[in-house]
């Protein structure tokens, strides 16, 4: 995506940057949703089967990094996008002030090269 956006001279705009909440660290392998929640449908693969397991591995790395640098998991996820896709715009929804504050922690700093490499590697597995 980075190469394409650079070649076309467009700014990447990431919608659903926290994966409908999966990258906030609040869900585990036993997650279930009400029938009226769109994430309960199989079309939302991030919350089902092998894709869920893969995403939870990414979340575990996000949690390790967030503990190491004293930032929220969502802040690390957002910062990863901003650092990996330079000049990108992140859209992340919130339901309450705590989520907003957690997301705001992504501002004013950068992930280390080591953290970016770890997250890039695990996301490509």
Predicted regions and their residues:
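Conserved short secondary-structure transition element at the edge of the structured enzyme core
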Residues: 17-18, 48-108
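Glycine-rich, positively charged active-site loop/lid region within alpha/beta enzyme cores that binds
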Residues: 2-63
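Extended hydrophobic/aromatic segments used for targeting, binding, or gating
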Residues: 110-125
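Charge-rich, low-complexity amphipathic helices
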Residues: 26-28, 34-35, 44-45, 88, ...
